């Protein structure tokens, strides 16, 4: 829809109370899925995954035993195996280091990990995944490049235990396509366009866990994240899925390691600067020749931060030339596309169709104010709603986040602020306190707008409308989608409120409604004399259907 098109009609908050009461009654009459998540029922007619016979290995405690029709055999001792893809048929000689057992993939089944999965929040379970193969003669619609269950992947039983323990029964849509490509042999690069909430973290996690040898105490896979918060969360996902394996993880972020200590874990997860520092120190810290997989998550966010893109390529240059490179990004403008093609050349590619990205699972409202001061007064009045579960309040500037937090605390409210200017240890403690429920309300900037998933969050407040920055025209709708995607996770109900206070912010909200094709309920802060009724409207919004 164009910007010139009239926005969807909004309703007053008073009307909203009556309407939501009706919706609540209607909801009680229906037991349907209503778009909140995929059912756990597995589909029939499994498609065979890419097959390359795994090479058996003696004395490898099961990690190298043959598994029929395995899509990956750890791929590193049998790099010349044929699997329909083009690529090097030799190991380029960098296996002068000890060669790990040849096969690590037996079975596995489950879906996403709880911390970064669920097809129920931002992304509905009806989106389509488009596959583009690096081998132009290959058929992307072939059953070889799709699975319907994790059992078809013949993953290691210890990985299967971890997935099942996490409570998942079937792959998400993107996992159905990504996992056969990631696990095939010889290993091929992969570029994926995927938002948080689609299962991509579990996908590249399973690939890393399948590629490393737990009997060799040195890093064999590296995952790069643009922030320490996301790196810590990815480590939690890897540890959860790999809990029954002997694979260890190491968090490579500032302050997490002694500069002269050798790393004896198989998977490194961290931020670019720290990873460069480790690799530059050479064999005293780790052996770069042993790295088999390099993963980059949230590439678009990383590119947006000055210097991180260059550091990422420095990491790539310090690794063997035939490392499997995997890149995921939520958006793919020209800069991201160019970066991705350089980072992962000759890659298989997976994309979500843009029109399939929806926000239907989240109840959206906007609160119309007259001034910045009235915005704060409205936020303070809403505090009782913010602590029904947990809430995140997004601001444009760090100073605004601190100012709001200080004022709310001075009024006796329990909140915390989080942004990039805080010390690393302080940021960790603040986010941990929010994760475990010690803090109910977090005032923050975009530092946790992407990828960070906390199940108890059921309200997001956009105190400031996200914009495109200097020289930009209009709202940053991608950031808005990522922000509100912090709520409504894992089948829970979610509510989003965005504040307006002047012509520009009101116009931006209209453009957001037009683009998303979804009306927002209007709350007029100027006429709010009965706070209880306003709270009732928001509470109903969080309980009722989106």
From Swiss-Prot:
Location, primary (coarse class): cytoplasm
SUPFAM superfamilies named in the record: P-loop containing nucleoside triphosphate hydrolases
Gene3D superfamilies: P-loop containing nucleotide triphosphate hydrolases
PROSITE patterns for this protein: DEAD_ATP_HELICASE (PS00039), HELICASE_ATP_BIND_1 (PS51192), HELICASE_CTER (PS51194), Q_MOTIF (PS51195)
Intervals of motif DEAD box: 297-300
GO process terms (BP): poly(A)+ mRNA export from nucleus; protein transport; translational termination; tRNA export from nucleus
UniProt protein name: ATP-dependent RNA helicase DBP5
Native source species: Cryptococcus neoformans var. neoformans serotype D (strain B-3501A)
Lineage: Eukaryota, Fungi, Dikarya, Basidiomycota, Agaricomycotina
Name of the encoding gene: DBP5
């Amino acid at each position: 829809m164009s910007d010139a098109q009239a926005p969807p009609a909004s309703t007053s908050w008073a009307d909203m109370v009556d309407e939501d009461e009706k919706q609540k009654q209607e909801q009680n009459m229906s037991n349907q899925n209503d778009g909140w998540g995929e059912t756990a029922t597995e589909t029939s007619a499994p498609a065979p995954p890419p097959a390359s016979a795994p090479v058996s290995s003696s004395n490898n405690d099961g990690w190298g035993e043959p598994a029929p029709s395995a899509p990956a055999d750890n791929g590193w001792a049998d790099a010349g195996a044929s699997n329909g893809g083009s690529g090097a048929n030799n190991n380029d000689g960098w296996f002068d280091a000890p060669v790990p057992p040849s096969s690590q993939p037996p079975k596995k089944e489950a879906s996403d990990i709880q911390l970064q999965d669920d097809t129920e929040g931002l992304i509905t379970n009806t989106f389509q995944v488009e596959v583009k193969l690096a081998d132009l003669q290959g058929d992307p619609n072939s059953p070889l490049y799709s699975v319907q269950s994790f059992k078809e992947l013949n993953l290691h039983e210890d990985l299967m235990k971890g997935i099942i323990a996490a409570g998942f029964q079937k792959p998400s849509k993107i996992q159905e396509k990504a996992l056969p490509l990631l696990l095939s042999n010889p290993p091929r690069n992969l570029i994926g366009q995927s938002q948080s909430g689609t299962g991509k973290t579990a996908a590249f996690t399973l690939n890393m866990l399948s590629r490393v040898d737990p009997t060799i105490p040195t890093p064999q896979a590296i995952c790069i994240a643009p922030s320490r918060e996301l790196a810590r969360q990815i480590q939690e996902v890897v540890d959860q899925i790999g809990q029954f394996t002997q694979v260890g993880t190491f968090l490579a972020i500032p302050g997490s390691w002694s500069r002269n200590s050798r790393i004896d874990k198989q998977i490194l997860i961290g931020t670019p600067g720290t990873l460069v520092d480790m690799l530059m120190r050479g064999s005293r810290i780790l052996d770069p020749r042993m790295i088999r997989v390099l993963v980059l998550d949230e590439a678009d966010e990383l590119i947006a931060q000055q210097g991180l893109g260059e550091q990422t390529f420095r990491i790539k240059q310090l690794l063997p030339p035939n490392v499997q490179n995997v890149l995921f990004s939520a958006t793919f403008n020209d800069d991201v596309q160019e970066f991705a093609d350089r980072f992962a050349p000759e890659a298989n590619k997976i994309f979500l169709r843009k029109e399939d990205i929806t926000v239907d699972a989240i109840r959206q409202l906007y609160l119309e104010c007259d001034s910045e001061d009235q915005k704060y007064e409205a936020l303070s009045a809403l505090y009782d709603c913010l602590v029904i579960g947990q809430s995140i309040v997004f601001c444009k500037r760090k100073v605004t986040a601190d100012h709001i937090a200080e004022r709310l605390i001075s009024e006796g409210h329990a909140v915390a602020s989080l942004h990039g200017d805080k010390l690393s240890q302080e940021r960790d403690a603040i986010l941990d306190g929010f994760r475990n429920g010690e803090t109910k309300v977090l005032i923050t900037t975009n530092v946790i707008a992407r990828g960070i998933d906390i199940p108890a969050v059921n309200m997001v407040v956009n105190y400031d409308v996200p914009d495109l920055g200097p020289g930009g025209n209009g709202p940053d709708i991608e950031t808005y989608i990522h922000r509100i995607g912090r709520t409504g996770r894992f089948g829970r109900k979610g509510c989003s409120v965005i504040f307006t206070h002047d012509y520009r912010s009101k116009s931006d909200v209209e453009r957001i409604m037009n683009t998303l094709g979804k009306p927002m309920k209007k709350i007029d802060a100027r006429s709010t004399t009965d706070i209880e009724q306003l709270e009732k409207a928001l509470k109903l919004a969080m309980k009722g259907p989106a």
